[in-house]
């Protein structure tokens, strides 16, 4: 029921956690049937090879670089090897490689170098800002971008 609800709400891409379903391929098929692009997310303990059979079916792979649950966690550096492995497995396929968790000015350049092309930054964007100080958010985003542009 969630896939249809997200699609009806206007989602373009729906990403499901690999570990949240017994049949990831069926979930990907259901997302596509709803008219959306399909993504699959991997928790830190899930090996890259787990999604090899899905590579011709997904538009996005999200590597969780923290354990899901709450914001502000520290980046798990061992996930760089998983990012590199997935980039190699993806090859020339048009699949986004997204990183979610602990993305900040200390980690952004490393994940981009490893092969990521979509970065999800939460706490690093919103630190120090407020409704009264919204310009801080833009400054934080620029600081993250500048780490891998140089």
Name each region found by the language model.
Residues 90, 129, 148:
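Active-site catalytic pocket residues across diverse enzymes, especially alpha/beta-hydrolases
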Residues 1-5, 9-96:
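Conserved anion-binding
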Residues 22, 26, 104, 149-150:
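Expand to "…catalyze enediolate/carbanion chemistry for C-C bond making/breaking, isomerization
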Residues 80-83, 108, 141:
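Short amphipathic alpha-helical surface patches that serve as generic macromolecular interface elements
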């Amino acid at each position: 029921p969630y896939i249809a609800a997200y699609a009806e709400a206007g989602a373009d891409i729906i990403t499901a956690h690999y570990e949240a379903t017994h049949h990831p391929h069926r979930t990907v098929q259901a997302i596509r049937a709803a008219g959306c692009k399909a993504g699959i997310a991997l928790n830190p303990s899930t090996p890259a090879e787990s999604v090899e059979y899905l590579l011709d079916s997904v538009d996005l792979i999200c590597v969780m670089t923290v354990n899901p649950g709450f914001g502000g966690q520290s980046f798990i550096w061992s996930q760089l090897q998983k990012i590199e492995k997935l980039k190699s497995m993806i090859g020339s396929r048009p699949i986004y490689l997204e990183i979610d968790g602990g993305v900040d000015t200390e980690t952004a350049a490393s994940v981009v170098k490893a092969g990521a092309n979509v970065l999800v930054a939460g706490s690093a964007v919103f630190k120090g800002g407020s409704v009264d100080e919204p310009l801080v958010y833009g400054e934080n985003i620029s600081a993250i971008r500048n780490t891998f542009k140089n």
